[in-house]
Each structure stands twice: as structure tokens, then as C-alpha cells.
Amino acid sequence: MKITKNKILKNKKIINFKYQKLLDLFYNVNNQKKNNQLLSYLYSFSGKIIFSLTEEKSLKKILRFLMRHKIHPQYIKRIIDIKKEIDYFYMIEEIKNGFIDKKNNILFLCTKDLLPILIDDKYIGNIKKNTNNINKFNLSQLILNHPVMHIEHGIGRYKGLTTIETASIQSEYLVISYAEGDKLYVPVSNLHLVSPYTGTSIENAPLHKLGGDDWNKEKHKISKTVYDHAAQLLHIYAKRESKTGFAFKKNIEKYDLFCNDCSFKTTSDQNEVMKFVLKDMSKPIPMDRLICGDVGFGKTEIAMRASFLAVSNKKQVAILVPTTLLAQQHYKNFKIRFSNWPVNINILSRFQTQKEQDLIFKHTKNGRINIIIGTHKLLFKNIEWCSLGLLIIDEEHRFGVSHKEIIKKIYSNIDILTLTATPIPRTLNMAMTGIKDLSIIAKPPAQRLAIKTFIQEYSPILIRKTILREISRGGQVYYIYNKVQNIMNIAERLSILIPEASIKIGHGQMKNIDLKKVMNEFYNNKFNVLICTTIIESGVDIARANTIIIENSDHFGLSQLHQLRGRIGRSNNQAYALLLVNNFNKITSDAKKRLEAISSVDNFGGGFSLSNQDLEIRGVGEILGKEQSGHIKNIGFSLYMDLLKNAIDLLKNGKIFSVEKSLKKPLEIDLHVSSLLPSSYILDINTRLFFYKKLANAIHEKQIEEIKYELIDQFGKLPDFSKNLILIAKIRLIADKIGIKYIKSNNNIGIIEFNDYGSINTEYLLKMFQKEPKIWKMETSTRIKFILHLKNDYLRLKWIINLLRNLFKKNI
């Protein structure tokens, strides 16, 4: 819902107001002076103040800030709910700019007024660059004694964090134990060298000897075989690039009109992804793009816009879906979305009679059908097209290898757009290596709440309580039971347990007409509890259904659980997922891991994370075959993917592959300063690990700045040691881009050694030696020394950053 100043006070009690624009009242976490100005203004304003906020993350941050300063706003749904005795309120609505209602003496403030840093639309991460690190698992999820991989020393076991002080310098270290009890202490500034090990079960993970030669031998051996695999993948890529496709042209006026018909405001992620899709479709090379976004994040709208572009170019669109229910759902949505345009949309599934199917085939051939949405029937050999231009594959993980082979044969020269919430490992692998283009929608729609997930042993009392809570607020419930032969018994049992509920069943073995009727009735709220199989896993989108109960949840795959849970939480109401097991003590270890994973990922955008965790649970054989999976077991998935990506980059750029280039030694930094997030600042170890890893994996300075502001917002002013940590992260980032081998410095001298001078501004380097010969000295052909007397660590680090920026040829 969008609110304007003319609309927000539309209630009869408050009308005809005069308004004035606000002064500069930004809440800026990096500027205490402005904070004080804002607070002073809020304290002194004589009337009511309403904070009109939308994004959940921003809402929490603003409320925390206000409460720290003794301002406790009360939540209201409507303007008329304001109370005389209270001065501060907040509501979940969207206004573009804050203003003052002078007539009623009300100050309205929006998110934009308070958090310009965090919602600046100009900063949208480059999707391709961000995906470079998608195979880097989150270190904050590390568990004591679980395997980790250090790129230089091999696979050991994580033993926690420890703070060590030497010569008055404090630093925090990640501790890894190796064979024979040896321990490695990794400075937190070097966490980019560490990743959780994934390749086989925890129990069977290798354990290397610290200082031994086995690890280096293994890396060298595998890096050679990786080259062959890289060449194979590049052959696939080159084959795709050599094909001739159709270059779509955009009629800007028509396209903008279609976009304006959208009933909701698209997120910045959706807009950015659509730019990539439009760019792909405009090229005379067939598009092959994977869009990964959680359920309900707006992938369908992107598919609709791509379809509109295709139809505008007189091309047909095929939308391939795994289930009849999803086909029905898309058919309804596409019909509504294209209702203002002369576009003929049809559906092909088992719900159509043979006569209807024959007519559809006829109209597909003669071009009367512009967009067809169908199940596996779209893969029939006898289907002919007039002018097919775009294939959209939804829920790609539901299609098997045989289906993929048919798609390759039938649809080899057209644009392909793949949509998924949980990509299968093979697709994930191709996306990670850049063979398949990848876009991620990570930002949820405004006002969407994360689903609360609970895992419990079976309990009739709990089931009754859960269902009654939902139907008492006018909602609906999915009850998943995946054995058709017993589903009637479940319905009888629930009818006795909850007589207040109206219950019906739905499953894939019902007659088409009966299943269609049940689903339509549930959609139209004719009953409130649907007992069904996983038939609703894809394609059911009902805003009122906000509770799902899954019996025998330990029998489901991780992707299945995520998809089922995604059927709820599509409105602004809090949604609940109850996963039931018969006996915790009797479920398998893999089932426990799946349930732990699904319950831990209740945040938005969890599908991608779950794909990685699914990979960890099931192993990697599915991705690359037996030989490669054996290599991955020996060195871990993360390093294997790094080696593969390095090999692909070398081959793409026409460089000669060498083991040395593939396994270049990581940058070493030793700056003799205290740099850590003290436990007095962040108590929780995993939270500290999370921020350490974020800093270590940053690929832009702007990302480091964002992390800095995130720390300040959540935990307050940065301690001096933490300021040093931020600066060292920037030094590492720039030094790595230049090609520095190591950089060492104390308060008196410093040494920089280069791998090569490829990215160095040699002109600037020569000027330094000529201008300040007492400071600079060339020790070897690749090593320079500088003499520096700065006792303040912070100033010294800033000086080094400035030096590195000047040394870098390109603008960082």
C-alpha cells in the first residue's frame, strides 16, 4: 500500500491539513552531531510524532535507537488510533518523504528521513561480483570439533576463538587442531583463508598433519585434474556462446506501461535482476540465466516481464512447471497480469481433455497462442511451434536428468530463464563457475515477516492448539501427510480432534475435476484446513494460509521442506511452520541435520543457504561424478571450487595454466597492531565470527564501510582495536588487488614485497624514491622498505592505505 500526504489522513476525524517539508533530520550512525539535532527536535516538538516505517530491519534499528534515548513509540494500525496521553507512535506503512501536518500538529517521519545510509538505492551490489563468494559457507555456523579447511595447512578441527596478547598487542585468533595434537592460531584478519570443510560426513573428514607435505601434494595433484574439468565446462560455455539466437528489442513505451500495471512495488533486487535479463535478451546469443530467489520474493513478476518482451517481439513463450497446481496458479496470475494486453495465454496439463490438448497443439503451431504454461507435456516430441523465443523453467530442481536432456534437444537455440528457490547442486556448480549466468533476489518484499519454524514430537494437543490459533484469526492451515492410503484416516482423526475446523483432503490420485474443485474451494476460503500430500509443494499461493503442519517431517528432503514451508507467509501476518516427528531418538542422523538446517534458516533468502547445506548433508557425488567427488573429499568443496574458478579464469583470459598460478600463496599481513572485536563489545563468539568473516570476504571498500556501520548500529561506537580491524580489512583488499605478496610494518619501518608489478603504478613508485630517498629503499627487485615514525597505530594504518591506493594503477 502506498500512502501520499493527501491520503494518509483520509479519516473523517482528520482532514484538510496543511503540511510543510522537514528540515534535514537524518539519523546518521556516523554523525553524533546530527543524532543530537534529531533527538533535540523530537523532544521539543509540541505535537504527536508518527514514525511511518516499512522494512523490518530498518524498523528494528530505528526503534532500538529511539528506546536508547527514552523514546518508546506505540504501534498503531491507523491514524485514528492515536491516543491523547501518548506522544510517539509508529505504523507499518510507506510514505516517500516525512512532513508536518500543521493543522493537526502531527510530525510524520519515514525510513528515508532516518536511515539514508542504509536504504540508498544507488548502492546495489553487483550481482555477478557478489556471487564470487557464494560457495563460502558462513563461519558463524561453526561448531566446536567440526572440520575446517585452511588453504595453506589443510583440514583440521575447529576449537574456538581465543585472544592472545604479545608485546602489548592484542589479537583474536581462530584455533584449529591438527593430527598429533598440533594447533594453528589463525589471526581473524586472515579468516579469508579458512572455510568450513564440506566433502564428506563430519566423521570421515580428513585430518592433516601440521607442517607435513601431504596437503601440498594433494593440492598440486588435484589442481592438475581441475584444469581438465575447467576445459570441459568452458567447452559447454563456448558452445552456448557460438549459437545464434534472437536479439529482442524493447518498445520502451509499451514495456513501461506493462511494468506500471504491476500491483506491488518491486524491490531493488528485482529491478537489478530484470536489467540483467533485458540485457541478455537483447543479445543475439541464447540467454541461459538462473534466477535464485526465495519463495514469494517476486521471481514470477520477472518471468512476466520477460514474457511481455518476447511477445512484443512476436515470439512465443513456453513456461515449463513441474505440477498441475503450479500450472493452474501461473495461468491465473498470467491471465490477470496480461488482462490489459492482446495476449493469448493457455495451459497444458492433465486437467485438459485430449480434445482440448489437440486444439492447444494446433494453436501453438499456427501461432494463435502467445504464452503457454504447461507441465511435462511441453516436452512431448509432437509439439510444434510457430515462433518460439523464450523458455521459462520454474522450480528447476523438480525436473530430472532425462527432462533436462529433452530440453537441450528441443529448446537449444532459444533464450532460457530458470527460476528456483533451491538450485540443485549441478546447477549451483555451473552458476558458481560462471558457466551459467546467475542472479540472486535476496531482498524480501516490504512488510513480509520471517516464518517461525518449530520442530516437535507428535502431539494431538499441540496440533489442536496450532490449528485453532490460525483459524481463530480467520486464517487457513495446510496439514501435510504424504501417504495417500492413510489420508482419510488422518482426516477423520483431525475432525474428531478439532470439530471447530472445516476439513477437506487433496492429493494427486484424485480425479482431476475433484482435485481442481477442492483447490478452488480452499483458494476461495470455503474451508479452513486442507489435509494434503506434497502436491501443494509448488504452485499454491494463498495469502490467508499462514500455518503449515508437516507430519513425519524427517522423511522429507531439505529442498522439499523449504518449498512446503514457502507455501505460507505470503501476507503481512506472522506465519508458523510446525514440523512433527514421531520419535526424536529414532530418526536418522541425516534427518536430524535436515531438520536442524531448516529450523536454523528461518530468515529471508534461506533457499540458497539450504542448497549449500543440502550439499553438505548429501555429499558432492551428484555434482561432478565419482572422480571429482573423490578430489573434493580430500581437499573440501570450497577449495575445489576456488581452484576450478581460477582455472576457468586463466583459460578464459588466454593465459597458460600452471599449478603455481592456480595455487598462488595468499597475502600475508603483519602490522603489529591490536585488531579485534573485543568480547566486551560483542559477547557472543558466533556473532564475532560472523563479522570477522564478512570483513575477510569483502570484495569492495564500500562493503567494509557497510559492515562498519552495521557494527556501530548494533553494538555502539567502535573500540580503537575494532577501528584497526576495519582499516586492516581495507589494506588486505587493496594489497590483494595490487598483487602484494606480504606487507609488514611496525611504528618505525615497513616492508612490502610484490608478486609482480602488473598492477603497480611504477611512475608513482619512482617519484617516491626520488622525492624521499631517506624514507624509501629498494631492497630487492620485488621488495621495498620504508622508514616511518608514526606512534599512533590508527594514523599509520591510514598512511598505509593511502600509499597502497597511490600504488594501484586502477581507481579502487
From Swiss-Prot:
PROSITE patterns: HELICASE_ATP_BIND_1, HELICASE_CTER. It is found in: Cytoplasm. It comes from the Bacteria. Residues 280-441 form the Helicase ATP-binding domain. Its EC number is 3.6.4.-. Couples transcription and DNA repair by recognizing RNA polymerase (RNAP) stalled at DNA lesions. Mediates ATP-dependent release of RNAP and its truncated transcript from the DNA, and recruitment of nucleotide excision repair machinery to the damaged site. In the N-terminal section; belongs to the UvrB family. This is Transcription-repair-coupling factor. The gene is mfd.
